[in-house]
């Protein structure tokens, strides 16, 4: 056998092998590789979109958090103003109620004092009449009259 014929036979066999591989083996391998490349590219683009969406969501969450904090601060401020208003109203009401009670107490004290004065006048008048009766009934000397007047003064 000649080396050239062997070489030619091997070249033909190799050529047939290459054609066979290109016809039946290569297309499924290329399809699998292309599918894998497409899947990887889709995954990367999906990851990129997800990253952008995440950044956008973080920005939105930060904005909403800031807005919520501002609203909370505003609500707290309104509550503090309302609290101060309620305290002022209560203080004004308590002050007016205090003045009313004091005025009523003063009026009661004045009425009681007036009643006590009237009672005292009645008692003084009764004592004066009783003293005058005793003086007229006894009609003794000046010393006895002075003694009766002194007793009346002591009773007053």
From Swiss-Prot:
Transmembrane segments: 11-31
Keyword Membrane on entry: yes
Subcellular location field: Cell inner membrane
GO CC, any one term: plasma membrane
Record GO terms (molecular function): proton-transporting ATP synthase activity, rotational mechanism; proton-transporting ATPase activity, rotational mechanism
Keyword terms of this UniProt record: ATP synthesis, Cell inner membrane, Cell membrane, CF(0), Hydrogen ion transport, Ion transport, Membrane, Transmembrane, Transmembrane helix, Transport
Keyword 4Fe-4S in annotation: no
Coiled coil: none
Record Pfam families: ATP-synt_B
Topological relation to the membrane, as annotated: Single-pass membrane protein
Gene3D superfamilies tied to this protein: 6.10.250.1580
Family statement: Belongs to the ATPase B chain family.
Subunit and interaction comment: F-type ATPases have 2 components, F(1) - the catalytic core - and F(0) - the membrane proton channel. F(1) has five subunits: alpha(3), beta(3), gamma(1), delta(1), epsilon(1). F(0) has three main subunits: a(1), b(2) and c(10-14). The alpha and beta chains form an alternating ring which encloses part of the gamma chain. F(1) is attached to F(0) by a central stalk formed by the gamma and epsilon chains, while a peripheral stalk is formed by the delta and b chains.
Entry function: F(1)F(0) ATP synthase produces ATP from ADP in the presence of a proton or sodium gradient. F-type ATPases consist of two structural domains, F(1) containing the extramembraneous catalytic core and F(0) containing the membrane proton channel, linked together by a central stalk and a peripheral stalk. During catalysis, ATP synthesis in the catalytic domain of F(1) is coupled via a rotary mechanism of the central stalk subunits to proton translocation. Component of the F(0) channel, it forms part of the peripheral stalk, linking F(1) to F(0).
Protein name per Swiss-Prot or TrEMBL: ATP synthase subunit b
Organism encoding this protein: Aeromonas hydrophila subsp. hydrophila (strain ATCC 7966 / DSM 30187 / BCRC 13018 / CCUG 14551 / JCM 1027 / KCTC 2358 / NCIMB 9240 / NCTC 8049)
Lineage start: Bacteria, Pseudomonadati, Pseudomonadota, Gammaproteobacteria, Aeromonadales
